[in-house]
Every structure is written in C-alpha cells, then in structure tokens.
C-alpha cells in the first residue's frame, strides 16, 4: 500500500526493520529485490527507462570487460581469451581455481593461468584477477609477490568479505590494488 515514488522512505523503513537480524545476507537481498521492483514500477508508470529516472546518461560509452576466464585446461583458456581479443575487449577478468588447500602446486597452477592469459592478451590491456573469497590472508600474502609481474589492475575478493583486517593488511602491502565488497 505504499507509493512507489516514495522509494527512499520505503527503503529506509525496510532497512530500519532489519536491525534485529543484521543488515547482511538475505535481509539485504530482499530489500534490494523490492528496491529494484520499485524502480521498475516507476519506469512503467512514467514510461521511462530506469536510467533516465536516475538522472540520465552520464557518459557516451561505458568500459566493459570480458569476465568468464575460469580455470580450465590452459589451451581452452587461451582460446577463450583469444576470442575476447578478437571481439575487441581491452579489459579481462580471470578467475583462479586453486587456493590454500592446494598448497604450492595450486599456487603454481594459478601462476600458470595468469601467464597463459597474459600471453594471449598482452600487457597493453587490463587484467583483473578474481579469487572469489577462496584464499586466506597468508595464502594471499604469498601469492601477491608472484602476481605483481602480471600487472593486475586489481585482485578481487582474495579473502572472505568479513575479514576487514585482512583487507586492510593486503591494502597496506601496496603491491596490487585489492577489490572487495561484492559479497558483503
């Protein structure tokens, strides 16, 4: 029974009511789903796309990156990277498949993945590296010096989202920009 154009009021009302069970996880997912639905309703009522409701275009072009370079046999990974290069991508995100439980051999495999991708895309492109919270602080601190030579634009979510001190310590190493917060 609320007016969808009162979206800020509705959002704050929902957010305040999550205090008892925490402001993370499913509660925030539910708020996000309702928020998206409100914007969609407002767009339908006004017959405008949501980006116009949010203030309109701010740039002529938006940079995008190829984001599916998963751990796989090296030849397949390189073939996939080549297809992205042919499509004109200049930014790429790869994902590591090995972590602390895989020991030195896993580290070696991660380095081989980075080498294989860089071999195809070259160094005049951006390479982002995704860990999907699969590493711990110690493993990440040992991997970073091995990854610096690949000139990554960032290392994404090396440790779990709640490890604020770990993120701070990695950031203070100042070797590779650290990205996180997607799974907060």
Name each region found by the language model.
Residues 173-178, 182-183:
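Ligand/cofactor pocket segment of small-molecule handling proteins
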Residues 26, 35-71:
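Glycine-rich, aromatic-flanked loop segments that form ligand/cofactor-binding clefts
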Residues 31, 36, 152-153, 178:
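Residue-level recognition of hydrophobic positions within alpha-helical transmembrane segments
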Residues 29-31, 181-184:
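Active-site nucleophile and cofactor-binding loops and adjacent substrate-binding regions
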Residues 61-173:
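Metal-dependent enolase-superfamily TIM-barrel catalytic cores that perform enediolate-based chemistry
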Residues 1-45:
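Metal- or metallocofactor-binding catalytic centers and their adjacent structured scaffolds
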């Amino acid at each position: 029974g609320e007016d969808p154009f009162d979206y800020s009021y509705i959002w704050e009302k929902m957010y305040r009511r999550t205090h008892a069970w925490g402001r993370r996880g499913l509660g925030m997912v539910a708020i996000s789903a309702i928020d998206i639905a409100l914007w969609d309703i407002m767009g339908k009522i006004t017959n405008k796309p949501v980006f116009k409701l949010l203030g309109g275009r701010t740039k002529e072009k938006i940079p995008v990156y190829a984001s599916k370079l998963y751990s796989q046999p090296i030849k397949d990974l390189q073939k996939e990277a080549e297809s992205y290069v042919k499509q004109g991508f200049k930014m790429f995100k790869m994902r590591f498949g090995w972590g602390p439980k895989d020991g030195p051999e896993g580290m070696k495999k991660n380095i081989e993945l980075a080498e294989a991708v860089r071999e195809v895309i070259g160094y005049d492109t951006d390479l982002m590296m995704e860990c999907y919270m699969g590493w711990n602080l110690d493993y990440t601190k040992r991997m970073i010096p091995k990854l610096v030579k690949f000139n990554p634009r960032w290392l994404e979510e090396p440790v779990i989202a709640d490890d604020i001190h770990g993120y701070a310590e990695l950031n203070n190493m100042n070797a590779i920009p650290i990205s996180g917060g997607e799974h907060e």
